[in-house]
Structure formats: C-alpha cells, structure tokens
Amino acid sequence: MPEAEILFSETSHYLKAEDVTQLKNAYLFGQGAHSGQFRKSGEPYISHPLAVAGILSKLHLDVPTLTAALLHDVVEDTDISKAEISERFGESVAELVDGVSKLTKIE
C-alpha cells in the first residue's frame, strides 16, 4: 500500500471522514506544488512531508497539524503563498506552515 494511503487509513481511525478528505486534498496540493522536485535520494520531494505527517499521525495529532505537516515546505520551496494556503486550508494551517518556515531562518 502506498505511503499516502497508509496515512489516510491510519488517520481514518481517529479523524472524521471530512478531516481525512482534507488531508487527501492537502497531499494532492503538496504533490502538485512539489512536482518535479526531488530529494537528494532521488525520491519525489513529497515523500518528506508525507513521512512527517505519518510520524505525527502516530501521535494522533489534529487535522490542522497534519495538514500543515503535508504542506510545511510548500511556501518555502514553491511559488505558493501563505495567503493561498490560508484560502484553501484555513488560517490556522497557514500560520503553522509559516511558523515552520520561519524556524529554518532562526540562527
């Protein structure tokens, strides 16, 4: 079973169906935003945000946190803006994504 399907299956045990749908939408959005980007290992870039979301799902974290995990590099590494994340997934998700992006700039 592909990693994304595992995430959706695992989260369906503790999230509502509409929340799992949001995760699927975030995954597809992130996959599209990172299209053509690859990790140093050669894997598609989306594999990293998906792995982060998978780890957080084992802690049974909420849907905004998991959504932000799937999107955490989108603003930093693509042309997608925080405003677009907010429009599509809500202000709380956009703030989480923005906060993670700012962590990389702390010295």
Regions found by a protein language model. Name each.
Residues M1-E107:
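Active-site helical microenvironments for divalent-metal-assisted chemistry
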